[in-house]
Amino acid sequence: MESSEPEPTEDASMDAFLEKFQSQPYRGGFREDQWEEEFDKIPLFMKKAPSEIDPEEFPDLACLQSMIFDDDRYPEEQAKTYKDEGNDYFKEKDYKKAVLSYSEGLKKKCADPDLNAVLYTNRAAAQYYLGNVRSSLNDVLAAKKLKPGHLKAIIRGALCHLELKHFAEAVNWCDEGLQIDAKEKKLLEIRAKADKLKRMEERDLRKAKLKEKKEQHQNEALLQAIKARNIRLVSESAGEDEDSASNGPAEILLDGLSSENPYGARLSIDDQGRLSWPVLFLYPEYAQSDFISAFHEDTRFIDHLMAMFSEAPSWDSEHKYHPENLEVYFEDEDRAELYQVSPDSTLLQVLQHPRCCVKALTPAFLVCVGSSPFCRNYLQGKKVHR
């Protein structure tokens, strides 16, 4: 009977081989301290491909890439390869590279309309996440042209219109998609949101139109009131005086009646048809000013002066600005002349003066202490009508 045990010569050979293997390290293998880095250089086990593939550093990967993107392959195969590459970038949220890959796939101009529709739709999604909503919508339209019933393209188009605040269009796209799949959850959600926003937009538009109509009626009433009082107006940018009585205020300052001045006030009319003006008081001695947001036309100047100077303002260090000491003037800019205003005059009486002109719908008056040296010097050389 033959023995199954190896002959002594075979055992000796195996022992010699193992001793040699242990004493001489395996050349070309991974180093113990760098095995992870070396492992990551093998294409099959790479966690992430390098952005730039150097054939000398990554020869295996460069070889695979040349095989994958071989121009000798059919356009459909190349386009699909770029589509898959774009999908990988998309999953990594690298949307810029995804756009580039999908674009390369479209450049192949393959004859498969479904594949091209997918490339357009996928690129639209990447563009959307990059914030290029109009580019995304253009791609969706191209995909829809190739494949009208492409549901993903319709969903993306609805999202684009929603983002662009085209709420009615978003609803229409959703309705089109729901004809294909009436239970599509995403379309139902988009439609509900778009319809709600569309209704809000329509409501706001109605409110804006009502407000505009109300303001138009108010402006017409203001214009009629100004014209009836023969008050002269001049626009802020006008080079020459524009008389409201002769030229017609509607042609002069219709837009100005609807706008506030820099202080946030505007000309108004009450239920009795009486006007209240924003008025500016200027104190040239101290380069100071006061603004009255609503100076009623039937109120006297002295009434406002008493209220403003019941206590000395912080800039009146000499405490000389008392109502009984103050003189008020308006300027005739055309003639460079000043007209003194009686403190007992109402605003309307002054505005109806033949030489008083209201600039930018805000009457302005100069105020100074009549007995002060500054006032005498300031008025010196000027023609003053008292």
Swiss-Prot record:
Name assigned to this protein: Tetratricopeptide repeat protein 4
Its localization reads: Nucleus; Nucleus, Nucleoplasm; Cytoplasm
> Subunit structure of this entry?
Interacts (via TPR repeats) with HSP90AB1. Interacts with HSPA8, CDC6 and TBK1. Interacts with isoform 1 and isoform 3 of MSL1.
Could you say which residues are annotated as the site Essential for interaction with HSPA8? K152, R156
**Record key words, sorted:** Acetylation, Antiviral defense, Cytoplasm, Immunity, Innate immunity, Nucleus, Phosphoprotein, Repeat, TPR repeat
The entry's note on the tissues where this protein occurs is:
Expressed at high levels in the heart, testis, kidney, brain and tongue. Expressed at low levels in the stomach, lung and liver.
Which residues does the annotation list for site: Essential for interaction with CDC6?
E77
The record's annotation in PROSITE patterns points to: TPR_REGION
**GO molecular function terms attached to this record:** Hsp90 protein binding
Protein family membership: Belongs to the TTC4 family.
Q: Which CDD domains match?
A: CTWD_Cns1 (cd21380)
Q: Which gene encodes it?
A: Ttc4
Q: Which InterPro entries match?
A: Csn1/TTC4_wheel, TPR-like_helical_dom_sf, TPR_rpt
Key word Lyase present: no
Question: What is the role of this chain?
Answer: May act as a co-chaperone for HSP90AB1.
Q: Which GO terms describe its biological process?
A: defense response to virus; innate immune response
The chain residues annotated with the modification N-acetylmethionine are: M1
- Which coarse location class applies to the principal site listed for this UniProt protein? nucleus
SMART domains tied to this protein: TPR (SM00028)
One cellular-component annotation, GO: cytoplasm
